[in-house]
């Protein structure tokens, strides 16, 4: 069964933080990448033009850095860009530095992705979500991670059906 890669030397996050890889996107039932869909939804929430341009630049840089294996993995969940999601088996979380103002609240942004163990160098984007700070944000984040895990499982099933 496909699972999150746990590299013998580098552990979790080996591709995004050490070896590099290439991106594919998990897609919805209409074939639209979740990453594209969620970026569009975020744009529709009246994010300011300046924040939008900064977000695009940061996401593009994050994706390039992961492809090159230049992100920082942190299993303490406090300092690095990438960590393993605690509540899911197959999901990694990349924290964006930028926060955006939505409806008068600063929101933290997270890219959820996986590094499937059975496809060499693959970085699979699962979701780009935003959350509040504090405990309510942690509850939102748990929901986002659970959704990303379901998307990973769906991606695995779709591959098997082909």
Language-model features: locations:
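Basic, Lys/Arg-enriched alpha-helical interface segments
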Residues: 1-107, 119, 130-162
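Active-site beta-strand-loop-beta-strand hairpin of nuclease catalytic cores
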Residues: 109, 116-126
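Short low-polarity hydrophobic stretches
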Residues: 112-113, 148
């Amino acid at each position: 069964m496909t699972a999150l890669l746990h590299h013998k030397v580098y552990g979790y996050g080996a591709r995004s933080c050490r070896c590099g890889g290439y991106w594919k996107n998990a897609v919805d039932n209409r074939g639209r990448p979740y990453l594209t869909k969620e970026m569009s939804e975020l744009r529709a929430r009246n994010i300011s033009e300046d924040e939008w341009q900064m977000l695009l630049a940061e996401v593009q840089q994050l994706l390039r850095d992961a492809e090159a294996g230049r992100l920082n993995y942190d299993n303490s969940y406090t300092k690095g860009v990438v960590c393993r999601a605690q509540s899911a088996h197959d999901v990694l979380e990349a924290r964006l530095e930028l926060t955006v103002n939505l409806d008068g609240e600063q929101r933290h942004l997270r890219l959820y992705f996986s590094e499937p163990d059975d496809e060499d160098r693959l970085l699979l984007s699962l979701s780009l979500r935003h959350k509040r700070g504090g405990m309510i944000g942690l509850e939102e984040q748990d929901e986002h991670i659970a959704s990303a895990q379901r998307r990973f499982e769906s991606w695995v099933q779709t591959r098997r059906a082909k």
